[in-house]
Amino acid sequence: YMEFGYKASKELFDVNKFGKWKFCDEENIRAIVGDNNSDMKLSVMADVGRCDYKKDIIDRKDSVIDMVRVATYVHQMPAAIEMIEDAKAKGYEVTCNIMAISNAKETDIDQALEMVGKSSADGIYIVDSYGSLYPEQIRSIADKYTELGEKYGKYIGMHAHNNQQLAFANTIEAASRGVSLLDATMMSMGRGAGNCAMELLLSFLKNPKYNIFPVLKFLEDYMLPLKESGAVWGYDIPYLLTGRLNQHPSAAIDFSKEKRSDYADFYTDLLDK
């Protein structure tokens, strides 16, 4: 699977201020992949409350997209279930990505999992939104999710953030507990501290069907120039601090944009939140 980007509402987000992959219009995806005559399936992310899904997510038979990943917080579960059922009825594979579980109550997570379990979603994702979780925590979380998955016939996925340099460690820990869909990005590119690095994960999997050479070539030809052009992502002290405190990285993103280096003052500000 490869995710193109978001299916965001053009009523809520200005098309002139965001790139085309914030909206993933069908014609823009087809301009890249045509009819996608390959074995690779394509997915998009749809955030609860930020997507006009009834209008913007068209029937699967008219789309080159295969999967819709519904991203939700635990308190939005009823709306998430509506989105899941809508996408499933349109013919898509569907996952439910429950975000910010490190900030949620155990009872709320359990209730959310039961709701997704009873839905028609194909899979459920563990999401370490703030990059604050450690491998031993992922172990118990993965066991909870996989047990639920076995009960309801759902596969489990893992989406990690690299605030504490643990995205790779947490991803392979999840894999060792039976989690089967592992999110990764080239050179760990992603919001803030980034995600699990694809090149790391492929090296770990040691499966002969995976060829590292095209990946390295892709990094050379595309990712290095992107970095050199000024695109910023990856582990940095501000992201470590928000991850350590289990906070959203927005403050760290702003800190980095301002090119600040007063880490101690920044940490004090975070502690006061």
Located regions from the model:
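Catalytic cores and adjacent flexible loops of soluble metabolic enzymes
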Residues: 1-273
